[in-house]
């Protein structure tokens, strides 16, 4: 009998990607986040689709339509809460997935890594335009502040900002186009995720040791399908706990007030997952400098593969690099905290020091640690 799984053109692709895929036998739970991100993306698209059925992208009715979804639509409150908190889970998984990639040297699969960075930027853009849609105070002022950064670009800045706005300020045209962007971008994310997977399957997965795993591989199914199913169950449990018991804990109270262009909130800040970048932006007193630092904080990820100096791929057996990695993690948590604080001392200086340390760690200290560890591994040491 011909095995359809291995011969059918479409089934064959699925089989080679999720069933008979040769996978290293020693990959840990840190390798679960790819599939969890896929699950998050599917949940977000489905919940978003149901929300879009009831949402109106008009400045006069957007806020009311979100209230209507939560009050009058069957299980609308649940769909809304899952979508809002699903974004937080998405970014949590994203940061852990990237952290894993840096720790275990997965960035040396350059194509996969670069597509991953483009994916991160696309997801960040999706989340930003999505945050504007409820048209609350923080939605409006967040959109105003962030889109205003475009005006810092020399010569074309103001024209570019007004082109994005569709007028002379954030208004009806901006909301309508942001809704259009928020609808289309997740499908671009799906396409990029498929390309990400395609490049990954060209090389095969990395593993915690960083050693070539070709001599010891096992089929993806049933071993890792079961493992992924467990991860997804735990993710769903965490999401439901957050959405049902504490749905507004990660949001901003200002967003419960309708957008008012005449009243600026005392502290304008984005959602928690953008706070680290926002802190870097604010740490430079110059507008253009801040914008460049903001861009550099994300785009620096693209040059991480070029800064790899160690003879070993993974940090598993490199204690100095490990220490620096965890300092970087603590530094990012510090930046996240600072991003949510008012612009006053001592927060200003802490933010500036943390921003400096962020770039110093990635550009200087970690490459130097790799060279030092190479030297320490020499027999004469």
From Swiss-Prot:
Cofactor(s) named in the record: heme b
Which protein family is named in the record? Belongs to the cytochrome b family.
Described by its record, this protein's role is as follows:
Component of the ubiquinol-cytochrome c reductase complex (complex III or cytochrome b-c1 complex) that is part of the mitochondrial respiratory chain. The b-c1 complex mediates electron transfer from ubiquinol to cytochrome c. Contributes to the generation of a proton gradient across the mitochondrial membrane that is then used for ATP synthesis.
The residues that hold heme b b562 are 83, 182
Keyword Membrane carried by entry: yes
The biological process GO terms on file are: mitochondrial electron transport, ubiquinol to cytochrome c
One short Pfam name that applies is Cytochrome_B
Protein name stated in the entry: Cytochrome b
**Keyword Mitochondrion annotated:** yes
- Keyword field: Electron transport, Heme, Iron, Membrane, Metal-binding, Mitochondrion, Mitochondrion inner membrane, Respiratory chain, Transmembrane, Transmembrane helix, Transport, Ubiquinone
| Regions crossing the membrane | 33-53, 77-98, 113-133, 178-198, 226-246, 288-308, 320-340, 347-367
CDD domains, per database record: cytochrome_b_C, Cytochrome_b_N
Residues where a ubiquinone binds: 201
Q: InterPro entries from the entry?
A: Cyt_b/b6_C, Cyt_b/b6_C_sf, Cyt_b/b6_N, Cytb/b6-like_sf, Cytochrome_b, Cytochrome_b_C_euk/bac, Cytochrome_b_N_euk/bac, Di-haem_cyt_TM
Tell me what else is known: Heme 1 (or BL or b562) is low-potential and absorbs at about 562 nm, and heme 2 (or BH or b566) is high-potential and absorbs at about 566 nm.
What GO cellular component term, any one, is given? respiratory chain complex III
Which organism's genome codes for this protein?
Answer: Murexia habbema (Habbema dasyure)
GO MF terms here are: metal ion binding; ubiquinol-cytochrome-c reductase activity
Q: Which residues bind heme b b566?
A: 97, 196
The topology of this chain with respect to the membrane is: Multi-pass membrane protein
Subcellular location as annotated = Mitochondrion inner membrane
| Subunit structure, as described in the record | The cytochrome bc1 complex contains 11 subunits: 3 respiratory subunits (MT-CYB, CYC1 and UQCRFS1), 2 core proteins (UQCRC1 and UQCRC2) and 6 low-molecular weight proteins (UQCRH/QCR6, UQCRB/QCR7, UQCRQ/QCR8, UQCR10/QCR9, UQCR11/QCR10 and a cleavage product of UQCRFS1). This cytochrome bc1 complex then forms a dimer.
Cofactor: how bound: Binds 2 heme b groups non-covalently.
